[in-house]
């Protein structure tokens, strides 16, 4: 028997990251659209004196960076999917991209809140008609971008939607939706300000938008940090795996480690004790019903 190469015992460590994904291409498209609209809104916000419009433009600037990070995460994970220095592949790169997006959302919320408070204390003249037109165009671009990313969001997620979520794509999607929200708030503030002859609604809407964006940021931070810290898999899921192995009457699971290694891919390390232990392959076969278990290591001990 040759030990130089044993393909039947080798494991793939790509975990679904080795091929280009639709989300990668669509994220690049949305990044280009967002960049173009960012330039228009920042320029118009400064020129027309609208804080809501300027806030939306600044918000878009953070999203251009976040979308760029998301696109880079897809490409990096794919290019290094088979790199042996990544012990369990590059599946968590997407979660890391989502975490970076969450941080970007938080920074955007802080910037918008700060500038809105300044504008609330020192109102400025606003060219309402011009600003409204630009805000409407921005909303159309944001909605188109959200549709592009939302289609992929549904396509990639199967089964348990929360557990199989593409956090990188989720982060990009939330950035676009946050842009759409600030565009809507800008339009409401500008139209109301024009009709009422008031400028205070403009920064107030900026404050409202910053609080909503901060809430989204917190949710994404919580979800992605769970993946990065291997704390995402539910107790219920762990119990189901344990029950599947303990179907043998004299077998007990004494140690179980379960964590995510990629979208729709989990890894498990299981230690079992039995008075009549079987080969590790027997226990792996008991777990075959869990199709998202991509890497399983079984440690078998004889009961004393």
Question: Model-derived features: where do they sit?
Answer:
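Alpha-helical transmembrane segments and adjacent TM-loop junctions that form the membrane-embedded core
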Residues: 2-16, 20-23, 58, 66-76, ...
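The first (N-terminal) embedded transmembrane alpha-helix
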Residues: 29-40
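Active-site alpha-helix of zinc metalloproteases
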Residues: 34, 51-55, 170-171
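Transmembrane helix interruption/hinge and helix-loop junction motifs
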Residues: 41, 46-50, 195-201
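Interfacial helix-loop-helix junctions of multi-pass membrane proteins
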Residues: 43-54, 121-129
